[in-house]
């Protein structure tokens, strides 16, 4: 307006008053037009304010609110993370403490620790768009937006007035990946499969086979199976803290897992045939590892003993292993195994024993006949005193199995020159002696063979000694000469036979050098043992016994006990229930 008033004088210098009047008229018309166009609005700030937040999305996400049909917005539940490492103790019932939370809070306040309470409104937002298959966003609160400025949202009230609400929080929404990320091990496994090619023909065949199986099933059975699967899905027992974990996630994860399983089945279908052999070998190795036994010599707590796998015991050298190396472990174990497992051999041995007994009885009868003939000759011929002396000396010489011919000749010379008849009798006796010694050696050899193959009963040894005694001349066994000095040499052959035989045949006890039936039973009740392990148990005890003798006595005891036999990894284990 000032520019107009200044220009008017330059245009018309004579009429200044008229120009001023025209300017005043124009100002009045402008004010009237401005008052007619201005609108006034009343803005109310309500006393009960509603909280309004701003959702900020990135422009690259191409979010269009108009296209959203199914939207769900909820707070994230971080109760578990907030609690952290604190123990979840029950507030009531078993294991609870009265007013534990209050006492814990008071204790913390004493030390100046003020715990922050969990605020659900401070947690980030979770936005789900489009249901199960739709997108998922997480809104994180941004700070510092409303520090230097105040932002309001204007809304129309029903009475026409405008209500202003301040904006409290700004949230930046970013998309969440719906798929499950792989762990380090899974990623490595998948990386190993990167060069594998999918065989879609096998997948198609599987689908066809599944379809055929479904057709074969009755419709009623299929309905029952579906109902059972639905029930299992419907029933879910969860904590109250997990109320935010929705079913949508679980369903989507289930679908993804199914797809993965189908792919893995198709990939692993070819490798199954090759993998079976390797799996069998691994199982065998595991079985070998499982067969570690606890070593304990004490008999305490036998019922409570357990077998544990120990790797440390394998590294340390075992003292019993050294003893096993020194001993003839393999041969003995094989021999014992044959003895314990072969029932057919036992039958053969029984038959052989019976035949030996029959032979011995036949020899006895022959000897008795010979004795009768000798006694008849004696009755017919009346010998002189010198002859009697010669007979007694001859019989004394015949009683000893280990006397030489030179001693016989010396005794005969000292007693005087014998007659021819006596010499004939002495020759007959020598022949009988040779027969008896041969028969006794046969019996001993047969019994020793039986002892090697199976434990021989001590009755054989006593029978052999009885045969010897019965085979002696009738003069020595007669009751008339029992008080005479000739009766004493009759006891010598028995003792000599018993010393020549091993303890197992001479009727001696098995417990002579520490191997008792009770000890063997105790070891076998404790845990299963191989034959060599059982032998080492007794070999460790410092006993001056040869390994052959040890094996003989052990076989005898094992035959009596008759333990249970199990072959594990080619080894035979013995144990008693």
From Swiss-Prot:
Record family assignment: Belongs to the TFIIF alpha subunit family.
One Gene Ontology term, aspect cellular component: nucleus
Biased composition (Basic and acidic residues): 257-271, 319-341, 362-376, 423-437
Post-translational modification: Phosphorylated on Ser and other residues by TAF1 and casein kinase II-like kinases.
Keyword DNA-binding: yes
GO process terms (BP): positive regulation of transcription elongation by RNA polymerase II; transcription by RNA polymerase II; transcription elongation by RNA polymerase II; transcription initiation at RNA polymerase II promoter
Pfam families listed in its UniProt record: TFIIF_alpha
Compartments where located: Nucleus
Entry-annotated residues carrying Phosphothreonine: 341, 457, 488
Species of the source: Drosophila melanogaster
Name of the protein in its database record: General transcription factor IIF subunit 1
InterPro entries on file: TFIIF-alpha (IPR008851), TFIIF_interaction (IPR011039), WH-like_DNA-bd_sf (IPR036388), WH_DNA-bd_sf (IPR036390)
GO molecular function term, any single one: RNA polymerase II general transcription initiation factor activity
CDD domains assigned to the protein according to its UniProt record, in alphabetical order: TFIIFa
Stated role: TFIIF is a general transcription initiation factor that binds to RNA polymerase II and helps to recruit it to the initiation complex in collaboration with TFIIB. It promotes transcription elongation.
Compositional bias of kind Polar residues: 471-489, 496-506
Gene, per the UniProt record: TfIIFalpha
Modified residues (Phosphoserine): 183, 246, 250, 252, 342, 352, 355, 453, 455, 482, 484
